[in-house]
C-alpha cells in the first residue's frame, strides 16, 4: 500500500486532479474537505454545534461519494453556504482530531490519493508522495465562479474573490493545522500548466 497527499488552497484544482490521479492509479480517492462539509451540513440542519454530536455522527466515504448517517450528501454539501460554515468548523480542534483519526484509518486499509489542506503536514506526514497545488487568487476565484454558474447558483465574481481571500487567510492563519506546503512536497502552479500536464507530472513522480 502507498499514499499520495495533495494539499493546496481552495480553487487550486486539487479535487479534480486528485480524482483523475486516483483513477489512473486505480486506488481510492479521499476528499477530506468533504468530511468537514458533511459536519457543517449536519450542524446546519440540526442546529446543534459540532462538538455536541461529533462522536456520534457517522461519516463514510466510498465510490467518490460522502455519506452522512447513511445518506448520500455529496450534492448537498457543495454550496457556498456549507463551504463557509465548513471553514469555520475546521478551526475546532475536537472536530479536526476526530476527522484526522478517521482519515488515517482509511489510509491504513488501502492505497489512497488524499487531498485537503493539511494532509502532508498533519494527516499523513509520512505519505509516500506529497504535492502542493496553487494558483493566483484571481485564477482560483474565476474557477470557483464558473463552477457556481454551471451549477445554476447565483454568484458575483467580486464576492467570490472576497470570500476566497477570506478563506485563504483563515486556512493559513488558523491555530490548528494551518495550510502550509509540507516538507518535501512538490510544488505545482496549476495556473501555468494544463490539467493533463499536471497529471503527467504527478504520474511520472509516482511511477518513476
Task: Show which residues each predicted segment covers.
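ATP-binding Walker
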Residues: 11-12
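Glycine-rich phosphate-binding loops of nucleotide-dependent enzymes
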Residues: 130-133, 137-139, 144-147, 187, ...
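Walker A/P-loop
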Residues: 15
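ATP-dependent NMP and nucleoside kinases share a basic, alpha-helical "lid"
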Residues: 83-86, 90, 94-151
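N-terminal phosphate/diphosphate-binding loop that engages ATP/GTP or pyrophosphate donors
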Residues: 23-81
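Hydrophobic anchor at the beta1->P-loop junction of P-loop NTPases
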Residues: 4-6
